[in-house]
Amino acid sequence: MIQVEHKWIKEIPVLHIFDETRASEQLPTVFFYHGFQSQKELYLSYGYLLAQRGMRVILPDAAMHGERHGAESDTEQAIYFWDTVRGNIDELPQLVEALNEEGLVDMSRLAVGGFSMGAITSYGMLAQYEWLKVGVCLAGSSYYEHFARALADGVAKQGMEFPYDVDERINELAPYDLSAQPTKLKNRPLMIWHGKEDDVVPFAYSEKLYEALVEEDMSDNVAFMVDEKAKHKITIEGMLAAVGFLEEKL
């Protein structure tokens, strides 16, 4: 039977999903991240399907989201979007360490994945942590600087003011920007899924990254899936492909 356990790890609320018959085993583990203005519970389908296939799954809530959502307005969530992404990236080692101390994870078989903001998060994690084995990025962008400037322009056009220096904040994203250093992927398995009609995170970002990886001779382990009609919403086919990719590569 698949178990869903709500717990707090290092003050981070997560859903922990696993097969109860293997509850105490060191299992391959997937950290899967939700999208902007969403929450961990909406991604339980991924956790269930992956746990059926023998993986341990951790669904965290990002800062300002889910159980970590305080009095922040929609505007504040938008203004601090990249702080939320960086928070996810910086918190990952804490989650891994805590689970390893409990003897629950196979440290040689760790993966990250996510949709939209979760995919953006996952790209940054792959740029930061060589110990991650697999990544699944659904409707995201690895082009941190370019996308950050586009988002900032959109926020400014709505009359919102930033309580910080935008250029300085964007410059701070450089270490997480996989597009600027694609060789950091180091031929690790990566699945990229994107809908061509995406009106939130442009499809061009995924296409451009794949082309860059091809140019660097690093596309052998990359699965690039394109949905010709999808907007900013993962399809059933995309979800099942992501689960199958993680099962195969992890």
Model-derived regions: residue spans:
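Conserved alpha/beta-hydrolase
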Residues: L49-S73
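C-terminal catalytic histidine-bearing segment of alpha/beta-hydrolase fold enzymes
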Residues: E207-L250
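Alpha/beta-hydrolase active-site loop
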Residues: A78-E102
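N-terminal cap/lid segment of alpha/beta-hydrolase-fold proteins
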Residues: M1-E25
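The feature captures the conserved acid-bearing segment of alpha/beta-hydrolase catalytic domains
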Residues: H146-E207, E211
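Short beta-strand element of the alpha/beta-hydrolase
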Residues: E25-G35
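The serine-hydrolase catalytic nucleophile loop
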Residues: F36-Y48
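Primarily recognizes the serine-hydrolase "nucleophile elbow" in alpha/beta-hydrolase
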Residues: L95-G154
